[in-house]
Every structure is written in structure tokens, then in C-alpha cells.
């Protein structure tokens, strides 16, 4: 039985040099189709091998929540498009040291709890090596992104194969910060703009920056660089952008038709592959048992290999239930539009 369980997890099949070469191949403009195919295979394996370290850290975070139902914890492997985009934007980055191939989201009601739980994790008896903290709450990104990130280098006493510079990022954020981040991603998905990467229409980016500053004021923390810490001024500029471009109405209009069995039929912990066709606005969901990580990874890789031809976006997530999945990834269900818009319209009334 233990042998079967060990086979669930992918091992690293390539050297550090091969992994970094794969990143450089993706980055180059003159790479051949054959070189790109091999590079993608290497990236898929390096990413999939992070599933075990990610699982270990995810389970520790789950235990930290106790019986709290207002805390969401999910894990995800970074999307191939996001990996490629990051490699091309950051020329000096080695794929071997990309810190968010595996990531956990830990979502709590208040900023105080963000810092308290992050400190609790840092002071716990984990064997992983603490690397760094990124405080985007006290120092928000110019894009408007606000969250607290901890980065750890995974260490295992029992599975030495994973002690290979596998970095896992934990994102601690409030529900309000999560609403903003997923609304931005929703707008990006359905308008086909890479807003998360700082690309897209200037007025769309400015709208989200201003709303993020409003939310920062609400939480009592610094506003985004280039905006005023003045609620009336922020609201006035948001109103002007919305009057010109109708972004609130656009977000409210986004709908997704769920093309799956009733979520309650698989409302349990495990792996979910969310497959969103943003041309038809349809979402398919595939559920896998916790022991079926290899099958889930295989499907995820297959879908991503055809992503450009099919207009499909996919993500592989582990969650405790279907309800937690929907709450943590509302952008794939387009549930975020109503809630985000309601919050914004409170200010615009």
C-alpha cells in the first residue's frame, strides 16, 4: 500500500541545468518547435514534482485553522501560461529558483489575522527553510495587489528526492484583498488582457488601482502608490472612469454556465481541474481523489498543451470541499462579479 502511495507523487526527472535551459528556451525568440516541446516537458515535470512539497505545507496550514469555517485554504500549481509569461518578463530569472510554482492561499477575515497566522506559521516547528517575506499590504504593488507572502524552501526528512530547491509560496490575504485580486483576474480572463502581469488597457488598470486604494483605506493600511489617501477623490476618479467605460456593468454582466454535475456530488476534499472556455463562457469541472494526483496532473498537462487552439484556461487546485473551491477561485465561476460590484457601488451611491 505504501508503495502505491509513493507512486502518487512525481519525482524530478531533470537536472538543475536542464531545468534552467528549458526556461531559457521558452524565453528565446529563435527556439525551434522541437526545442519548445522538450522545454515544455521539462517545465511540466518540474512543476508536477512540486505537488508533494505543496501538499505537505497545505496540510499544515489546514491544521492551523482548527474548526474555523471563515478561513479558506487552497493549494495550486502555477499555470503554464503564467510560468511562460514570468520567464519572458523577468530575463534574469532561472526556472530552478522560481518561487511560486507551488502556492497556497490562506484567506482570513482581517488584516490582523493575516499577520497573526503568518507569524504563527513562521514560529511553528516546520523543518522547511524560511527564505523571505513580501509584505504587499504595508508596501502594495503599483498594480494594486495587496497580500502577505512567505516563501519557504521545502525540506523532508523522509523523501530526499524533494530536497532540491523546491520553493513554495504561501499567500496570506484578507477576504477583501481576495475579492479584489479575483475580480482583476476575472476581468483579465474575459477581456483577454494580462492584467495580473501589468498589461492591458490603462483605464482598466487605473480603475482597479483606485478600488484597491479604497479597500486599503477601509482596512486602515497604505494606499497604492500614485493615488491619494482621500476617499472622496478616489471615488470621484472611479466614477469618471466608470462613466466613460462602464466597467462596473461589464463585471456584473460576466456569467459562466456551469457544465458539470451538481457540485454536491463531489463535495469533498481532493483535486479539482477547472476548465474554463472563455469563448463560450462554459466551465467544466473534473474531480480527482487525493490519491489521484498523477491522473489530475496528466489531464492538466493535456489541456494546457492545447490551450492556444481551444481558447481554454485551466487550473489544478486542491481544496477541502467544492464549497471551499468556489470561495477561493470565484473567478472561474464568475461569482466574484456581483460581490465586487456591490462593494464598489456602495461607494458610488
Spans of features found by a protein language model:
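An acidic, glycine-/histidine-flanked metal-binding catalytic module
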Residues: 1-39, 162-272
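Intrinsically disordered, low-complexity polar/charged tails and linkers
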Residues: 2-86
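Short, flexible, solvent-exposed loop/turn segments with mixed acidic/basic and small polar residues
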Residues: 88-99, 274-275, 302-306
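Helix N-cap motif at beta-to-alpha junctions
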Residues: 109-113
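Short Gly/Thr-rich strand-loop-strand
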Residues: 121, 127-159
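A short, exposed loop/beta-hairpin motif centered on an aromatic-Gly-Thr core
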Residues: 282-291, 315-317
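A short, charged, amphipathic alpha-helix used as a generic interaction element across diverse proteins
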Residues: 292-307
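Short, mixed-charge low-complexity intrinsically disordered segments
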Residues: 309-348
Amino acid at each position: 500500500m505504501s508503495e502505491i502511495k509513493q507512486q502518487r507523487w512525481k519525482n524530478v526527472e531533470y537536472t538543475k541545468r536542464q531545468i534552467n535551459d528549458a526556461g531559457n528556451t521558452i524565453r528565446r525568440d529563435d527556439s525551434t518547435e522541437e526545442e519548445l516541446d522538450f522545454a515544455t516537458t521539462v517545465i511540466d515535470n518540474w512543476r508536477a514534482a512540486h505537488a508533494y512539497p505543496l501538499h505537505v505545507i497545505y496540510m499544515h496550514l489546514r491544521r492551523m485553522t482548527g474548526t474555523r469555517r471563515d478561513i479558506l485554504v487552497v493549494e495550486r500549481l502555477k499555470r503554464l501560461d503564467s510560468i511562460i509569461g514570468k520567464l519572458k518578463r523577468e530575463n534574469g530569472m532561472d526556472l530552478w529558483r522560481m518561487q511560486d510554482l507551488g502556492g497556497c492561499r490562506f484567506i482570513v477575515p482581517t488584516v490582523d489575522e493575516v499577520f497573526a497566522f503568518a507569524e504563527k506559521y513562521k514560529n511553528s516547528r516546520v523543518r522547511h527553510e524560511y527564505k523571505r517575506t513580501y509584505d504587499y499590504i504595508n508596501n502594495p504593488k503599483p498594480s494594486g495587489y495587496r497580500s502577505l507572502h512567505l516563501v519557504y524552501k521545502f525540506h523532508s526528512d523522509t523523501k530526499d528526492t524533494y530536497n532540491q530547491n523546491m520553493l513554495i509560496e504561501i499567500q496570506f490575504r484578507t477576504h477583501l484583498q481576495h475579492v479584489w485580486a479575483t475580480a482583476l483576474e476575472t476581468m483579465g480572463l474575459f477581456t483577454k488582457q494580462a492584467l495580473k502581469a501589468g498589461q492591458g488597457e490603462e483605464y482598466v488598470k487605473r480603475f482597479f488601482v483606485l478600488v484597491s486604494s479604497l479597500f486599503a483605506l477601509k482596512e486602515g493600511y497604505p494606499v497604492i502608490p500614485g493615488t491619494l489617501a482621500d476617499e472622496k477623490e478616489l471615488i470621484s476618479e472611479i466614477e469618471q472612469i466608470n462613466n466613460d467605460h462602464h466597467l462596473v456593468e461589464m463585471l456584473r454582466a460576466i456569467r459562466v454556465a456551469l457544465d458539470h454535475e451538481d457540485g454536491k456530488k463531489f463535495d469533498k476534499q481532493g483535486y479539482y481541474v477547472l476548465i474554463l472556455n472563455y469563448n463560450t463562457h462554459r466551465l467544466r469541472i473534473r474531480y480527482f481523489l487525493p490519491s489521484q494526483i498523477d491522473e489530475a496532473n496528466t489531464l492538466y498537462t493535456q489541456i494546457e498543451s492545447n490551450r492556444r487552439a481551444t481558447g481554454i484556461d485551466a487550473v489544478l487546485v486542491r481544496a477541502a470541499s467544492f464549497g471551499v473551491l468556489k470561495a477561493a477561485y470565484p473567478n472561474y465561476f464568475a461569482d466574484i462579479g456581483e460581490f465586487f460590484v456591490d462593494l464598489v457601488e456602495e461607494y458610488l451611491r
